Amino acid sequence: MIIKQAEFIISAAWKKQFPIDGKDEIAFVGRSNVGKSSLINAITNRRKLVKVSGTPGKTRLVNFFMINNDFYFVDLPGYGYAKVSKKELEKWSQTIEGYLVGREQLKKVILLVDSRHKPTKDDITMYNWIKYYDYKCIVIATKSDKIKRSEKVKNEKLIKETLKFNDSDEFYFFSSATKQGRDELINNICSGINYSENSL
C-alpha cells in the first residue's frame, strides 16, 4: 500500500456534513496532545496535512482527508483536556459518539495512547466505545522514541491490561519523529479497505 495523495476535504461540525459517497473510512482518535496530527502527517508523508496545534483540545470538528481518491482518513476531536468547561467536554463526547453510531463506511478505528503512561479513564472509555459499536481497533502507542527499548515490553503489558485489550485487535509502537516501521503500519492500518490499483 502506497499513499500517493492526501487531501483535506472538510471539517464537519454536524453529521449532515459528513461525506456521503460511501467510500471506506479509517478514523483516528486519542486524547489531546497524544500526537494524532503528527501521526497522520507522518504516515501520509505530508508535513502540514493536519495542523499540529500547540493548544491542547483545540480540534473540535471531525476532519476528513481523502487518501489516493479511494478512501478517507478521519481525524476525530481530541478528548480529555481538563481546561475546558463541562459543557464543552459533553459536546466533544457527543461529536465523537455521533460519528461512531451507525457509520457503515467506518471500517476500523485507530486509538492512540501515550507509550510513556498508563491509559487514562478517557482512553478506557474510548476503547470500550469502539468495542461496543463493534469496530475493528488498532491501538498505537505514540512517542515511542521517548522510552527505552527495555521499557517497551513492560509498557505494552500495562497498556493492554489497563484497556482489557481484546486479542482480536492489533497493537503497535510508533514515533512520528523517527517514522520507524511506517510502511508496515500503513499496510496494517489500510488492510481490508477498498482501494484501487492507484494505491498499489
From Swiss-Prot:
Entry-linked PROSITE patterns: G_ENGB (PS51706)
UniProt entry tagged with the keyword Magnesium: yes
The EngB-type G domain, residue ranges: 22-195
Keywords: Cell cycle, Cell division, GTP-binding, Magnesium, Metal-binding, Nucleotide-binding, Septation
GO cellular component: cytosol
Cofactor or coenzyme needed: Mg(2+)
Residues noted as binding GTP in the record, renumbered to the chain: 30-37, 57-61, 75-78, 142-145, 174-176
GO molecular-function terms, A-Z: GTP binding; metal ion binding
Protein name stated in the entry: Probable GTP-binding protein EngB
